[in-house]
C-alpha cells in the first residue's frame, strides 16, 4: 500500500469515472449455465460453492493505483456484476449497476455471499490480492482471466509494465457476447447415448469439525522438481498428482483403526475437472468444465504406486476423448431440456437436484483435485509476482476434503480445503511426495 494509506474496515467504494452511456443496461440478465444450475439447490452457509484465487506480489499493493484499476474495469465484466434471482421455473442472474468493492482480507476463506452482495469479491492484504467467486458465475479458468485483467491493469496503472498487446481482457474493450455464452448448450450434440453409471466409492472416515468447519492448508513445491518426478513415470503432472491422491487414500484405508463400515466400499475414485476450452473453441468466462473420474478397485487387491500411475494414465486418456466428453455434455444438457423438468416449478426442481447431488453425485467419488495448470502473465508482469494460490470451494460432508493446484514460474502451490478434525490425508499426500524426492514447504496463512 502507499505510504500512510490504510484499508478501511468497511468495503472500500470508489467513484465511477466511466461514461454513463457505456453502462450495461439494467435489463441485462442471464440464464444459469448448465454447470451452474446445481449450485443454488445445494449451497448453504457451509457448502458455499465459493473458491479463491490469489496472487502474492513481490511488493505491497499500492491502494490508490489498485482502486483506480478496479474502477477502470467496472464496465468490462458486466456478466460478473450479477445477483441471483428466483424465477418460477429456474434461477437466473440479473445485472446490477453497482460498483465493485475492494475489502481488506483477513476473514474466513471461501465464505458464502449475502443476498445483497455480488457473487464475487476482491480482497487485499499487504502484498496479496485475492478474488473469490461463486461457481454460479464462473469456473477457475474464467476467474483467473478476471484476476489477470485486474493485475495487468494495476501494474500498467503503476507504470510497472509498459502497455502491450499481451492477451487479456482490457478495460477499454467492449465485452463480446461469446464471453458470457453457455458453452455447454452451444456445443451439445443431440441424441447421444448416456455415459455408464458408476458405483459408490470409498469416503474418508474422519469426524467433522464444529462450525465454522472449513480451513485451508497450502504447500509450496518447486515446479521443476515435481515435473521431473512426473516425467520419470512418463506422465503429466495431473496424472501424477491424482495417483498420489489415490495412493494416499489407499494408505489411509489400510490403517487398522478403520471400521468395517468405511471399508464396505473398496473403489477409490477421484474427480478431476477438465477445462473444455482446450477441446472446443469457446471463449466463455462462465463455467465450461466437466469431470473425469480415474479410479482403483481394491477388491482386486492392493496397488503399487506404479500400478496406480498406469491405471490413472489410461483412465485419463480414455475419458478425455472428445467423443466421451460429448456424451457427458449431451446427458447433462438433455436433462436440463427435458420437457417435464422444464415445466416443473422451481421449489420441486430444487428438491430433485438436491437429491440427485447427494445420491448420484457425491457418493460416487472419494476426492476432488483441480489443477488450473501453469499460469503466466507475460509482458514483464511475471517479475512482479511471487506465486499464485488456488483454494477450492468447501467440500460437502461426504467428501470432506478438496484439493486445488496452480503453478506459476518456478513455484507450484498445492492447497487442501478440509472440514474434518483430521489432517491425515494431507500428511499422507505430502509423505508420498517427499518419498519421491519432492521438497515441500508449508505456506503460513
Which residues are covered by each model-predicted region?
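Non-catalytic N-terminal regions of enzymes
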Residues: 2-179, 227-231, 238-258, 363, ...
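Acyl/amide activation-and-transfer machinery of modular secondary-metabolite enzymes
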Residues: 45-57, 87-104, 116-118, 207-218, ...
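Flexible, P/S/T/G-rich "lid" or insertion loops adjacent to the active sites of thioester-utilizing
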Residues: 181-235
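Short coil/turn segments at secondary-structure boundaries
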Residues: 196-202, 323-329, 445
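Helical lid/core segments from catalytic subdomains that handle acyl or acyl-like groups
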Residues: 214-216, 287-375, 380
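Short, positively charged interaction helices/loops
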Residues: 255-271
Amino acid at each position: 500500500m502507499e505510504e500512510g494509506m490504510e484499508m478501511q474496515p468497511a468495503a472500500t467504494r470508489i467513484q465511477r469515472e466511466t461514461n454513463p452511456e457505456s453502462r450495461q443496461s439494467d435489463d441485462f440478465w442471464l440464464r444459469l449455465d448448465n454447470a451452474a444450475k446445481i449450485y443454488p439447490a445445494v449451497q448453504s452457509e457451509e457448502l458455499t460453492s465459493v473458491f479463491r484465487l490469489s496472487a502474492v506480489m513481490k511488493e505491497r499493493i499500492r491502494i490508490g493505483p489498485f482502486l483506480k484499476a478496479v474502477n477502470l474495469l467496472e464496465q468490462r465484466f458486466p456478466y460478473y456484476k450479477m445477483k441471483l434471482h428466483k424465477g418460477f421455473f429456474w434461477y437466473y442472474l440479473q445485472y446490477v449497476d453497482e460498483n465493485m468493492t475492494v475489502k481488506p482480507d483477513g476473514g474466513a476463506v471461501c465464505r458464502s455471499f449475502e443476498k445483497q452482495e455480488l457473487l464475487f469479491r476482491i480482497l487485499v492484504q499487504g502484498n496479496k490480492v485475492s478474488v473469490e467467486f461463486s461457481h454460479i458465475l464462473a469456473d477457475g479458468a474464467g476467474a483467473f482471466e478476471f484476476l489477470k485483467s485486474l493485475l495487468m491493469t494495476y501494474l500498467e496503472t503503476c507504470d510497472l509494465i509498459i502497455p502491450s498487446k499481451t492477451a487479456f481482457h482490457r478495460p477499454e474493450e467492449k465485452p463480446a457476447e461469446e464471453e458470457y455464452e453457455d458453452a455447454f448448450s452451444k456445443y451439445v450434440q443431440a441424441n447421444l447415448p448416456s455415459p455408464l453409471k458408476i458405483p459408490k466409492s470409498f469416503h474418508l472416515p474422519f469426524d467433522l469439525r464444529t462450525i465454522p468447519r472449513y480451513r485451508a492448508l497450502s504447500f509450496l513445491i518447486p515446479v521443476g522438481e515435481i515435473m521431473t518426478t512426473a516425467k520419470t513415470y512418463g506422465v503429466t503432472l495431473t496424472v501424477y498428482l491424482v495417483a498420489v491422491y489415490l495412493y494416499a487414500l489407499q494408505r489411509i484405508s489400510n490403517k487398522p483403526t478403520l471400521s468395517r463400515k468405511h471399508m464396505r466400499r473398496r473403489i477409490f475414485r477421484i474427480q478431476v475437472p477438465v477445462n473444455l476450452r482446450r477441446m472446443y473453441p469457446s471463449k466463455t468466462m462462465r463455467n465450461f468444465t466437466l469431470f473425469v473420474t480415474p479410479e482403483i478397485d481394491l477388491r482386486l487387491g492392493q496397488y503399487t504406486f506404479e500400478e496406480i500411475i498406469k491405471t490413472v494414465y489410461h483412465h485419463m486418456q480414455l475419458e478425455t476423448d472428445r467423443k466421451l466428453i460429448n456424451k457427458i455434455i449431451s446427458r447433462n444438457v438433455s436433462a436440463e431440456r427435458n420437457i417435464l423438468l422444464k415445466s416443473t416449478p422451481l421449489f420441486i426442481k430444487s428438491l430433485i437436484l438436491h437429491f440427485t447431488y447427494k445420491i448420484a453425485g457425491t457418493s460416487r467419488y472419494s476426492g476432488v483435485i483441480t489443477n488450473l495448470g501453469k499460469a503466466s502473465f507475460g509482458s514483464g508482469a511475471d517479475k512482479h509476482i511471487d506465486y499464485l494460490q488456488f483454494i477450492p470451494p468447501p467440500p460437502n460432508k461426504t467428501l470432506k476434503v478438496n484439493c486445488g493446484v496452480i503453478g506459476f514460474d518456478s513455484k507450484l502451490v498445492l492447497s487442501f480445503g478440509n472440514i474434518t478434525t483430521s489432517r491425515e490425508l494431507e500428511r499422507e499426500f505430502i509423505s508420498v511426495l517427499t518419498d519421491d524426492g519432492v521438497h515441500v514447504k508449508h505456506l503460513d496463512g
